[in-house]
Amino acid sequence: MLPSSMPATGRLLPTQQADGHTQMALDAWLLKRSNGPVLRFYRWDGPWLSLGRHQRHWPEHWNELVRRGRLSLVRRPSGGRAVLHAGGLTYALICPDAPRRRQEAYRQACQWLIDGFQDLGLPLHFGSDPAGGEANNCFASATVADLVDPCGVKRVGSAQRWQNGRLLQHGEILLDPPAALWEEVFEEAAPAAAPAQINRLELDQRLRQSLVQSWSHCPWQMQPLKADEVQELEVELASGSAL
């Protein structure tokens, strides 16, 4: 549950499909502009590899894959390591006044996911691997920021960004990772797909409902972007100042 000081109304945005630059710019813009909690789900136009905000080094062959048109590269406003966005579902959750302790912040920001997947018949638990490590791949380990399924597969990887007392939590829900591309990028076998019982077409709606139920003290409203918000975002995208 979110802190009682949270503003009275939360904002739900419709699920969107767009290129990586637009998606990351929108999340950064929402973090700067939103005074209340926000949740949105989205998918990516084509395969994208997102780099963590502070990730400065990555394998040279990733650049070659970009040159060959196998994927596109973008930097996230959140931290963490590289995530391959293909065959999955991404979420962005913005929380004002979230707990400053990292583990507690992740716990509060992930419980609705645990509840939602439990209702779908897939129990998840927090990871226990130590933070850090040398792997470039976010899904190479599962820390207390991540959610793991009963088979030991990291099913949700999360990363955070704090700005002016607001928390942005990014999460990638691993559903159907592309085996060939995953091996090209990370030089290891792709994780197993999510169980067939997880309805890919309805997952965003079901998890959205889980958040509303879990944070029932806060009324939520579906509020698509307004025309002036779209215009402001386009200006920031054009200027390159969004992140």
Please provide the spans of the model-predicted regions.
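Residues forming anionic-ligand binding surfaces in small-molecule and nucleic-acid pockets
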Residues: P77-P96, E184-A194
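Internal, conserved structured core segments that host functional sites
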Residues: G87-V144
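Long, positively charged amphipathic alpha-helical accessory segments at protein N-termini or as interdomain linkers
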Residues: R100, Q111-A131, R161-L243
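Short beta-strand-to-loop capping motifs
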Residues: R53, L93-D97, D149, L175
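Short acidic-glycine loop/turn motifs at beta-strand connectors
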Residues: D45, D149-G152, Q163-N164, P177
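Active-site loop/lid in soluble adenylation, ligation, and acyl-transfer enzymes
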Residues: M1-E60, E64, R68, S72-R76, ...
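Aromatic/basic-lined ligand-recognition segments
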Residues: A142-V148, G152-Q160
